[in-house]
Amino acid sequence: MAPKKGVKVASKKKPEKVTNPLFERRPKQFGIGGALPPKKDLSRYIKWPKSIRLQRQKRILKQRLKVPPALNQFTKTLDKNLATSLFKILLKYRPEDKAAKKERLLNKAQAEAEGKPAESKKPIVVKYGLNHVTYLIEQNKAQLVVIAHDVDPIELVVWLPALCRKMEVPYCIVKGKSRLGAVVHQKTAAALCLTTVKNEDKLEFSKILEAIKANFNDKYEEYRKKWGGGIMGSKSQAKTKAKERVIAKEAAQRMN
């Protein structure tokens, strides 16, 4: 059988829009003294306070310059879901604040005055302070070390992942020294450490440890070789691409 010929369907003509000749089209002129320009992001032209200006410059420099692997590993932080479950456990083991300590000491003093035996059981709490955390890692007492990604100067903690790996202690890098500080009633904290957990939390804690080991301890060799930075700005990238196009064009002409 011969193929059927397609029947052409007549395209519908769109009705022409009737414009009133009294209303003239006047395209906007956005030059000086002209119409107001459309709204756009002008944040790069704002005169920021010095502290914010330094933050912005530091961020740009980290993108432009080549960042060595030891520093670049602090850009690889724990993912949001795992960080949420980790902080839930850390908050369970917060150290006592001033009010709780005062109440405990008062109760202890009252018990001693009444001749009752005072409770001498040591509570399980999160350990903090860089020297204390380092000592616990060296003594192999630490079960998990949590390091902040934005410690300033970074030299304070840059060696800590290597020490944790050498002592085979699970470690992770999380966002926010202030978030770590909030756990231990401080403004900021460079590193936190857990030495043990209660029996009811052991199952959940072991799952978190497995995930952290897979993300950090097992990938240490990979992070040790990976440099960061070297990303140029949009203008610089455009110039480079234009140069490459010219070079490619000249090479093609020579070949012909």
From Swiss-Prot:
One cellular component (GO) term of this entry:
plant-type vacuole
Name of this protein: Large ribosomal subunit protein eL8y
Question: GO molecular-function annotation terms?
Answer: mRNA binding; structural constituent of ribosome
The ranges of region (Disordered) come to 1-20
Instruction: Name the lineage.
Output: Eukaryota, Viridiplantae, Streptophyta, Embryophyta, Tracheophyta
Q: State the PROSITE patterns in the record.
A: RIBOSOMAL_L7AE
Q: Where is the composition biased (Basic residues)?
A: 1-15
Question: Which Gene Ontology terms describe the biological processes this protein takes part in?
Answer: ribosome biogenesis
Which residues span the membrane? none
Q: What family does this chain come from, according to its entry?
A: Belongs to the eukaryotic ribosomal protein eL8 family.
Keywords associated with the record: Ribonucleoprotein, Ribosomal protein
Please indicate which superkingdom the organism of origin belongs to.
Eukaryota
Identify the InterPro entries for this entry. eL8/uL1-like, Ribosomal_eL30-like_sf, Ribosomal_eL8-like_CS, Ribosomal_eL8/eL30/eS12/Gad45, Ribosomal_eL8/Nhp2, Ribosomal_eL8_euk
